[in-house]
């Protein structure tokens, strides 16, 4: 239904194969789906995984080279923009467009999270955004780049940032982690950092230990990994997937052991 409510390229007016989450029909559809899950299962939370506007260009580069084209400039977005700002939505992104996209992108997640919390306050809501740093790591104005807007949502419990490639410098890991923890604390959320468990393994598995030590030392509340068993047997499997999976598990046990020991001392 409502297949016309899709995202549109700003430069070419091409209708893309992605729903526009600023249309009321998709917002209703998404909220209703999530509510059905909450009402008919014993799920304990929801995870908003790297939400973002579509890329008219089909790829992104590590240095942010996905081009200048953007979405969404569909009839619904154009109408909302003009009603708010008093002029036609431009094809070239300006500051008003950036603000509009940030603001509108949050509506679907905020409204759905609110409905879920009203149904069951115990549901844990996590929002995971891309681990960007200026324009270095595929920022490309995805729509959720304003971390303050995301982390300040009163219906989110956990502020999470995505996986970082093992090939990137340690300083980048530290910078993203520092910002993640700071943003979570600012808005009284738990912080979460991810460990890369697919595609590429670190050259030395000791990098896993270092990353976990870094996250722990910087006050990260939660650690997460994708994907299961290093993607073993899938097209995204890491080199030596089971060895990587085992190393990640060893670090989880190590961190949990330290936490349990600390709890025993406090009690």
Predicted feature locations:
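Active-site-adjacent "subsite" loops/lids of carbohydrate-active enzymes
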Residues: 1-41, 81-95, 110, 206-208
């Amino acid at each position: 239904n409502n297949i016309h409510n899709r995202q549109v390229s700003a430069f070419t007016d091409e209708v893309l194969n992605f729903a526009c989450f600023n249309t009321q029909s998709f917002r209703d559809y998404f909220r209703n789906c999530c509510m059905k899950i909450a009402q008919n299962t014993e799920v304990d939370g929801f995870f908003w995984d790297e939400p973002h506007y579509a890329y008219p260009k089909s790829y992104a580069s590590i240095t942010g080279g996905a081009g200048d084209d953007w979405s969404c400039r569909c009839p619904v977005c154009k109408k909302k923009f003009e009603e708010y700002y008093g002029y036609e939505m431009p094809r070239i992104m300006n500051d008003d467009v950036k603000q509009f996209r940030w603001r509108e992108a949050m509506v679907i997640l905020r409204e759905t999270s609110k409905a879920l919390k009203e149904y069951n306050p115990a549901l844990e809501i996590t929002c995971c955004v891309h681990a960007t740093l200026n324009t270095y790591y595929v920022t490309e104005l995805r729509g959720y780049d304003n971390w303050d807007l995301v982390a300040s949502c009163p219906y989110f419990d956990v502020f999470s940032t995505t996986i970082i490639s093992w090939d990137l410098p340690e300083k980048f890991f530290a910078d993203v982690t520092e910002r993640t923890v700071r943003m979570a604390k600012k808005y009284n959320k738990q912080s979460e950092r991810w460990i890369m468990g697919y595609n590429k393994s670190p050259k030395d598995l000791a990098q896993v230990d270092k990353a976990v030590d870094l996250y722990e030392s910087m006050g990260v509340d939660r650690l997460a990994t994708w994907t299961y068993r290093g993607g073993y047997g899938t097209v995204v499997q890491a080199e030596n997937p089971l060895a990587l999976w085992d190393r990640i598990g060893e670090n989880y046990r190590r961190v949990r052991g330290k936490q349990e020991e600390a709890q025993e001392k406090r009690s």
